[in-house]
Amino acid sequence: MNIREAIAAVVARRDLTQAEAASVMEEIMNGTATPAQIAAFLTALHIKGETDAEIAGMAAVMREKATHVYFDGPVIDTCGTGGDGAHTFNISTTAAFVAAGAGLTVAKHGNRAMSSVCGSADVLEGLGVQIELDAEGVARCLRDAGIGFMFAPKFHPAMRFAGPVRREIGIRTVFNILGPLTNPARARYQVLGVASAALAEKLANALSRLDTVHALVVHGDGGVDELTLSGPNLIFEVRAGHALRQMIVAPEDVGLERAPREALRGGDVAYNVALVRAILSGEDRGPRRDVVLLNAAAALVAGDVAPDLATGVKMARASIDSGRALERLHRMIAVSRGEA
């Protein structure tokens, strides 16, 4: 199916198969689709609503076109789709260091702020990490620091064909949710935060169509794209060879206290950098630490090193209290800057 046929099908509200969506994405990613065709397709798909099969087909092509990072061993990614308007601090980025301190190798894939004030790239840069590394530089961080960061624009060169169109049409499209599914290090373990419950289930089903080994797709209380402390959280567990499993987990279920969403608010880059340092150093021991423990626990479960979230919280706490989480940050800064 070519993109003109796909536009006609989607306008008629017909869902594409995974293979058809992949075929269209090939045209977009190799530059043969025109800007007008890309805009028409993305807009029509947005109006119809993307299916998990369509998302998976497009993600598979985007993964293949990415500049790959090669690492000999399993890696996990922790990220969210954004767009929740909650203005929390960089929870998943902080949790990544805690998970790394507990033994996981974290291949974080992210960008600068889109809908927030401070994205993962912004806070890491503020912490002193060199964020614009090439594939070998990231692989070196994974090997020597246990955590690496892939700055999305640098690893998805084929996005140059769709990027200008996305900016011009100015609406959220399927590309807003493809980023977290297209890790250049081919992370087969993942924690993916989603602001919409319906989209969370859809992305969980999309991950099950890809080569995922174990993932937790989480939707926080109040529509946050992280596990949060304000109430019950919805979790979809994706495990290779198993049916999708749905869970509801409240903070008290894993030994943590509830806290209002306002307690997790972030600020500008300088503010969030100070927060990350305070949490990893053990100085901040309030709800911001607790929400990091909860999200790091999810990574430890998805990464198959913790049997359940309650155990994961204990392991995450030990990662901070032992100094291992902060050491991962210091190590990542040094390795990324060529100082180690």
From Swiss-Prot:
Binding site for 5-phospho-alpha-D-ribose 1-diphosphate: 80, 83-84, 88, 90-93, 108-116, 120
Molecular-function annotations in GO: anthranilate phosphoribosyltransferase activity; magnesium ion binding
SUPFAM superfamilies per the UniProt record, alphabetical: Nucleoside phosphorylase/phosphoribosyltransferase catalytic domain (SSF52418), Nucleoside phosphorylase/phosphoribosyltransferase N-terminal domain (SSF47648)
Top class in the EC scheme: transferase
Entry annotated with the keyword Kinase: no
Catalytic activity: N-(5-phospho-beta-D-ribosyl)anthranilate + diphosphate = 5-phospho-alpha-D-ribose 1-diphosphate + anthranilate
Swiss-Prot/TrEMBL GO biological process terms: L-tryptophan biosynthetic process
Keyword set includes Transport: no
Entry binding sites for anthranilate 2: R166
Residues that hold Mg(2+) 1 according to the record: S92, E226
One Pfam family matching this protein: Glycos_trans_3N
Subunit structure, interactors included: Homodimer.
Protein role: Catalyzes the transfer of the phosphoribosyl group of 5-phosphorylribose-1-pyrophosphate (PRPP) to anthranilate to yield N-(5'-phosphoribosyl)-anthranilate (PRA).
Protein name stated in the entry: Anthranilate phosphoribosyltransferase
Native species: Chloroflexus aggregans (strain MD-66 / DSM 9485)
Gene from which this protein is expressed: trpD
